[in-house]
Amino acid sequence: MAKDPGRVLIFDTTLRDGEQSPGASLNLEEKLAIAQQLARLGVDVIEAGFPFASPGDFAAVQRIAQQVGGENGPIICGLARASRGDIKACADAVAPAPKQRIHTFIATSDIHLEHKLRKSRKDVLGIVPEMVAYARSFVDDVEFSCEDAGRSDPEFLYEVIEAAISAGASTVNIPDTVGYTTPTEFGRLIEGINRNVPNIDEAVISVHGHNDLGLAVANFLEAVKSGARQLECTVNGIGERAGNAALEELVMAMHVRRRYFNPFFGRDEDSPTPLTAVRTEEITKTSRLVSNLTGMVVQPNKAIVGANAFAHESGIHQDGVLKNRLTYEIVDARTVGLTDNRISLGKLSGRSAVRARLEELGYDLSREDLDDAFARFKDLADRKREITDRDLESIVSVQVQQPDAKYQLKLVQVSCGSSLQPTATVTLADENGQEQTAASVGTGPVDAVCRSLNQLAGEPNELVEFSVKSVTEGIDAMGDVTIRLRRDGQLYSGHSAHTDVVVAAAEAFVNALNRLVAGTAGPTIHPQLDMAQLDSSPVH
């Protein structure tokens, strides 16, 4: 049997695989904020990025290793393909962390070998031990992944895993890269590895999976029963295509059904010892932070963290819950940190009180960003009677942005009505503080604002998404606007919140423009990386 740490290790890949969601690109400060909250959540491993892919990814992994990795904190991990350049860049990026891991991978399915890598099985069996050993020359903790393991020949998979462990891999990851397997199949795959890999007792079995058929969480739970002891997942289940296995669903499934899972760990059924190290009361806070910073809206009926997860519409259900919550609720909302979100902050509240509450919500702002956030808070307090945590989160998420933003919105003014042509006047300042003003007409006030901003910026783009949602209840609620722009096939998202949705739209558009400019101004590929080498993309 594989190594058993006595519980399930949670490997969070929100900052790597999660960021591969179209339009979910994060800047360095946003990644750092999420990493700090993941540490508070109690995950065991943070996969902070793919260092060789770009200078930005390298810098983010290095900064997280410096500021989040600690003796008592999570392992900081970077992803690397099975090549020396990737592995060296990864080693350099994670070096500042007291607990470091290199996660290297290569595809093992015949379809990937033939059409993507153009390599034989023999080639792969030669590459794997060489690259794992090379990674071990930098760190003691090496994880090896067999990309597309779910569609690989099991007998070949056993050979590859044995070779990786012999070369020094302490964790072997089994990815269902395209979300193809069913729970029974995936469980049998893990059982087969346990039975047929001679040295499997020297490594922890990890699993990674995508949700293309909606089975990722079910597959993982079956894998746990079969001996997997590390789960690679993302907050809110974000990720490539249909997403990844959702961290919050996995953790709470094992929390609520602990009596069911305990025997698979050799424990008494009634053992109260948690199956993960995750602090469940941090789940809601983490979910909201990731949603705010990525602009990826959580569907209302999403398990555990959706807006309706603890709502009851049916009269029969409402009656039962009022009599005893256990009649229709298997999870106490307080267990995942969901409480009354009204807070005692108002227009008389001071800067220190706001800072303290923001830190509780997972935001550690610089002095300058805190000043900006506090000014926005005071402005909102003058216009809105009650301030909630959701309001604060919406305010501050706007502040966590590129410090070298090229454009800053100075003025937005619109004129519209049932018998008027919608017109917008906007003033934009560049990085040198020079201001320019433009006016445009449009089909509506938001269209007119966007036309004016494009006229001033002169950055080619296509608006592919405009969405607005209410942050809280009430007619004085803030409107949270998300805008996505497309250029050269890449998506750039921006969002903002304001009681005036037209102003929020203007701010969100400028935020997206700044991301677009930052994303196209410099090299997106690591200087050492030959474009032809990118035939093996990190989507395992």
Curated annotation (Swiss-Prot):
Family label: Belongs to the alpha-IPM synthase/homocitrate synthase family. LeuA type 1 subfamily.
HAMAP family to which the protein is assigned, alphabetical: LeuA_type1
Stretches for region Regulatory domain: 408-540
Keywords, sorted A to Z: Amino-acid biosynthesis, Branched-chain amino acid biosynthesis, Cytoplasm, Leucine biosynthesis, Manganese, Metal-binding, Transferase
Species annotation: Synechococcus sp. (strain CC9311)
Subunit description: Homodimer.
Gene that encodes it: leuA
SUPFAM superfamilies, per the entry: 2-isopropylmalate synthase LeuA, allosteric (dimerisation) domain, Aldolase
Catalytic reaction list: 3-methyl-2-oxobutanoate + acetyl-CoA + H2O = (2S)-2-isopropylmalate + CoA + H(+)
GO cellular component, as recorded: cytoplasm
Binding-site list for Mn(2+): D17, H208, H210, N244
Pathway: Amino-acid biosynthesis; L-leucine biosynthesis; L-leucine from 3-methyl-2-oxobutanoate: step 1/4
Pfam families associated with the record: HCS_D2, HMGL-like, LeuA_dimer
Domain Pyruvate carboxyltransferase, residue spans: 8-273
Compartments reported by the entry: Cytoplasm
InterPro entries (alphabetical): 2-IPM_HCS-like, 2-isopropylmalate_synth_dimer, AIPM/Hcit_synth_CS, Aldolase_TIM, LeuA/HCS_post-cat, LeuA_allosteric_dom_sf, LeuA_bact_synth, PYR_CT
Protein name, as recorded: 2-isopropylmalate synthase
E.C. code: 2.3.3.13
CDD domains: DRE_TIM_IPMS (cd07940)
